[in-house]
Structure formats: structure tokens, C-alpha cells
UniProtKB/Swiss-Prot annotation:
Gene source species: Chlorocebus aethiops
InterPro entries xrefs: Tetraspanin/Peripherin (IPR018499), Tetraspanin_animals (IPR000301), Tetraspanin_CS (IPR018503), Tetraspanin_EC2_sf (IPR008952)
UniProt xrefs under Gene3D superfamilies: Tetraspanin
GO cellular component terms, semicolon-separated: basolateral plasma membrane; immunological synapse; membrane; plasma membrane; tetraspanin-enriched microdomain
PTM text: Not glycosylated.
Coiled-coil regions listed in the entry: none
Record's comment describing the protein's domains: Binds cholesterol in a cavity lined by the transmembrane spans.
The protein's role, per its UniProt record: Structural component of specialized membrane microdomains known as tetraspanin-enriched microdomains (TERMs), which act as platforms for receptor clustering and signaling. Essential for trafficking and compartmentalization of CD19 receptor on the surface of activated B cells. Upon initial encounter with microbial pathogens, enables the assembly of CD19-CR2/CD21 and B cell receptor (BCR) complexes at signaling TERMs, lowering the threshold dose of antigen required to trigger B cell clonal expansion and antibody production.
Keyword Lipid metabolism attached: no
Cytoplasmic side stretches: 1-12, 85-89, 225-236
Protein's name according to its UniProt entry: CD81 antigen
């Protein structure tokens, strides 16, 4: 015997929430893949300075997002199917998956908040090392290539923390090509541009995480209410 009355409304409401959750999983997966293949981040994070690769903390977070998006799509489908079939077993499994996902999201959020400045800091240190090598050693072609990639990708020139090297940077043609000396001097320093690059992307991820967390809380409540309704309807 199927559910009736308010429980039936909850059933379809849960289906709608799960469909939205499934779509959110698809959006997160799509955004993660976009961030993974975004030309700006790809150009910078695939660089190597001698035997030292660029910091990969950002990409670790992106791979986690890809996994989360895929799992969300699976869990959303499970919830939709469980609600339509009025299956207590599927809804119980769905609830358990949601609790695990929610706990993982909270843990990831805490880790992200604690380390939110570390990604940009690591990339800035990598840039500074390359800049110093490129200016000090005329034969450091690898370092010069790294610095030029930073400058052309971010449209910046030099660093305020290494202001003494600015003249050498201009003299060695390490600033974006096609710009004159005055325009290069007026460009933002690369530390500021690196901060802007990663803070914008982390802000986008943070908004998505909050929206998904709210949806998950509603889904956990609705799935338990529907489970109780199905159990009670089978008694009568």
C-alpha cells in the first residue's frame, strides 16, 4: 500500500530535492573539471623549476571535488529511486550516504578554512625562487621560462617583496612581451595577482559547498520522515 496525504507530498518533495542534489553534483563535477583544465591554473601549476614541480595542493583539492561531484550524482539518483519506490532499505542507505558525505564536507570545509592561504603562499614562494634564479643567473633558462609564464599568464610584472629586483626583471625582458617599460612598471605585482586568482576560485567553491550542505540537511530530515511514513502505512 502506497503512502497517502502529507507523506505523499514529502515523497515527491524528497524526489525534487534529490533531483536538485543530483544536478548540484553534476555542477560541482563540471566546475571541478573546469578548474582542473583552466588555462591560468594549468599554465602555472604544471611548471617545473629544475627538479622541483609547482605546488600541487590546489590540484589535490580539485581531485577531491571531482570525486565528491561523482558521488553526489550517485547518491542523488539513489535518493530519487528510493523515494519513488518507497523503499525503506534504499532510503536508509541514502540517509547513511548523506551522513557520511556531510561529515566529509564539514571536515573538508575545516581543512579548507585552515589552509585557505597556504595554496597561494606556496605558489608565491615558488614564483619568488624562480624570479631570484632568473635574475641572479643569466644561464638559468628554466627559471626565466617559469617567470615569463607567470608574467604572461597573470599579466603582472615583478613582486613588491622583491622590489630590488624590478630593474633587473625589466632589463632581462622577463615582463609580458609587447608592453613598454612604463606599462610594465604600472602592472600589478605578481603576488597580488596570485592571491586574486586563487581567492576567487576558493570563494566559488565555498558558495557551492554551503548550498549543498543546506540541501543535504533538508534531505536527511525528509528521508527519515518518509521512512517513518512508509513504515506506518504498511501497518494499516
Amino acid at each position: 500500500m502506497g503512502v497517502e496525504g502529507c507523506t505523499k507530498c514529502i515523497k515527491y518533495l524528497l524526489f525534487v530535492f534529490n533531483f536538485v542534489f543530483w544536478l548540484a553534483g553534476g555542477v560541482i563535477l563540471g566546475v571541478a573539471l573546469w578548474l582542473r583544465h583552466d588555462p591560468q591554473t594549468t599554465n602555472l601549476l604544471y611548471l617545473e623549476l629544475g627538479d622541483k614541480p609547482a605546488p600541487n595542493t590546489f590540484y589535490v583539492g580539485i581531485y577531491i571535488l571531482i570525486a565528491v561531484g561523482a558521488v553526489m550524482m550517485f547518491v542523488g539518483f539513489l535518493g530519487c529511486y528510493g523515494a519513488i519506490q518507497e523503499s525503506q532499505c534504499l532510503l536508509g542507505t541514502f540517509f547513511t550516504c548523506l551522513v557520511i558525505l556531510f561529515a566529509c564536507e564539514v571536515a573538508a570545509g575545516i581543512w579548507g578554512f585552515v589552509n585557505k592561504d597556504q595554496i597561494a603562499k606556496d605558489v608565491k614562494q615558488f614564483y619568488d625562487q624562480a624570479l631570484q634564479q632568473a635574475v641572479v643567473d643569466d644561464d638559468a633558462n628554466n627559471a626565466k621560462a617559469v617567470v615569463k609564464t607567470f608574467h604572461e599568464t597573470l599579466d603582472c610584472c615583478g613582486s613588491s617583496t622583491l622590489a630590488a629586483l624590478t630593474t633587473s626583471v625589466l632589463k632581462n625582458n622577463l615582463c609580458p612581451s609587447g608592453s613598454n617599460i612604463i606599462s610594465n612598471l604600472l602592472k600589478k605585482d605578481c603576488h597580488q595577482k596570485i592571491d586574486e586568482l586563487f581567492s576567487g576560485k576558493l570563494y566559488l567553491i565555498g558558495i557551492a559547498a554551503i548550498v549543498v550542505a543546506v540541501i543535504m540537511i533538508f534531505e536527511m530530515i525528509l528521508s527519515m520522515v518518509l521512512c517513518c511514513g512508509i513504515r506506518n502505512s504498511s501497518v494499516y
